[in-house]
Amino acid sequence: MPPSKQTIDKLCAVANEPDAHGYQPTSGLPELHSAMAGFYKRTYGVDLDAKTEVQPIIGSKEGILHVTLAFVNHGEEVLVPNPGYPTYTSLSKILGAKVVNYDLIENDGWQPDFEQLEQMDLSRVKLMWTNYPNMPTGGNARMETYKKLVDFARRHNIVLVNDNPYSFIRNEHPMSLMQVEGAKEYCIVFNSMSKSHNMPGWRVGMCVTNPTFISWI
């Protein structure tokens, strides 16, 4: 399916503007920041500071790259779901970090195995990846799961990243990890237009978190 007609029409109109084809600010136009913050407010009821808590990205893959570079050092460990998206492991391995898989429980709707996680040695874990709604399983997180994940990250001082490009798919009520109280302190969330708006080739996404993490990313 192509993007909506309104999207294509707007692209054609903007393409005819005289300043549309020059270099743009590295961090994105202020209007784009504001639009993304507005999207979060309308969709999830989450208030974000458009200037300091939102970073436009070239799809989730760029976000995965920059977050890994910002937070992971050689010899540290990264928690990755099994099954999960292979890209979460690639850069960590290049940087010399150790990828540690944690299981998703099939008969519990592919929720994380928190019992397994709590039994792990987490002393060298710097970053944890989650992906809900999940690819490849299609499992969807519950708000209870999001709350447990935020609590887990807080107690173990781990940066938690949820990749959320499927928020509108098979889901009448889109959810975000950022709806959990205190999530911004330890968590980062990616959203992408690729799946929800049929725009994979446009490479439009966003990263939201606290101002300190945004400055590092």
Predicted regions and their residues:
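N-terminal small-domain helix-loop-helix segment of the aminotransferase-like
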Residues: 1-59, 66
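Conserved core segment of the aminotransferase class I/II
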Residues: 11, 182-217
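Short acidic capping loops at alpha-helix termini that bridge into adjacent secondary structure
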Residues: 47-54, 74-77, 124, 184-187
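Conserved PLP-anchoring active-site segment centered on the Schiff-base-forming lysine
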Residues: 70-92
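A short helix->loop->beta-strand "cap" motif at the edges of active sites that frequently abuts
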Residues: 76, 97, 155-159, 183-185
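A short helix-loop-beta submotif of the ANL/AMP-binding
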Residues: 94-100
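Active-site phosphate-binding strand-loop segment of PLP-dependent enzymes
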Residues: 100, 104-175
